[in-house]
Amino acid sequence: LVAGYTGPGGKTILPGKAVAKLDLRLVPNQTRAEAEKKLRAHLDKHGFTDVEVNVSGGYDPTEVAEDSRLVRSELATYKKLGVTTSLNPRMAGSWPGSTFTSPPVSIPAAHFGIGHGSGAHAPDEYFLIDSTNPKVAGLVDATMGFAEFLYVLAAIK
């Protein structure tokens, strides 16, 4: 939220405008367009009809059935590589998966991979290139994991 004087020191002036940047997260069965309409309706209901809303991006939700060939192949690959798994049906992050899962393409899409990294999109983001711990995968192991996944995917009907 930015409003009023933002330079050095302080000034007691009334702001001519205020700007708020929002990051909306969707709940199951909600679309980006629906979230935008609900935001507009909420502002209007509370007397803020003069507030301008500029949408700068966003994606519809992505969901893939647990029993889909894609997810079964991912789980089989993890098992073959000796990786303990857990399914996370909803992520806090965003990605344009709906480009693939919605018409006209309508194919399953999901996140997958082995390897260790953290801090996605942060200044301290990292991915382990070479691991000295046999229980922690580095870049080579991650790459081979993707190759193994393709073989498993081809074998599963």
Can you annotate each of these PLM segments?
Residues 1, 6, 10-18, 83-154:
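Zn-dependent metallopeptidase/amidohydrolase metal-coordination segment
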Residues 11-36:
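C-terminal catalytic subdomain
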Residues 23-28, 52-67, 90-92, 96:
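A short beta-alpha structural unit
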Residues 35-44:
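Short amphipathic alpha-helices in soluble, non-transmembrane regions
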Residues 48-54, 157:
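Flexible, glycine/charged-enriched surface loops at secondary-structure junctions
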Residues 62-80:
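Short, low-order "capping/linker" segments at domain edges
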